Amino acid sequence: VCSPFRADTREQREKNLRAARAYMFYANKKMNMNAAAPHAYMPLLLCDEIPAERAIALRFGLEILEQSDVMLVCGNRLSNGMRGEIVKAALLRMPITVFDEGLYLEVQKLVTQNNGDKKSVKLDRENFPMAFTEPESYLENAALFK
């Protein structure tokens, strides 16, 4: 799961953590994927504000990515960290699924700029909650968490 983590405020960062957990949950329950979102839990162990600890967390996330079969780009914006993960996925020739139509061309462009194949980027309109910035609200209402 590739989604925003870093934020200007603690409240926004907490919102991003909840969203990452919801994306992971949705991918597991509705898409039958063993999805991983290391950034949803790493902040419990490492502090994003300490550069050395952030570097450890980023390396760990990239190592998890290397073991993955597909990247799921969630939400409706790309953070710098997400861009780095997408570049890594392109270098690995990994299939990438995007859920937000507005990000689709942006991700394709980023992939081709890094010698990847834009055909490896797929737009999935069926699993639209993965494009929401606050997916947990939708999922709670859909009774997925109950």
Place the predicted regions along the sequence by residue.
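Conserved catalytic or regulatory cores that recognize and/or transform ribose-phosphate-containing ligands
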Residues: 2-146
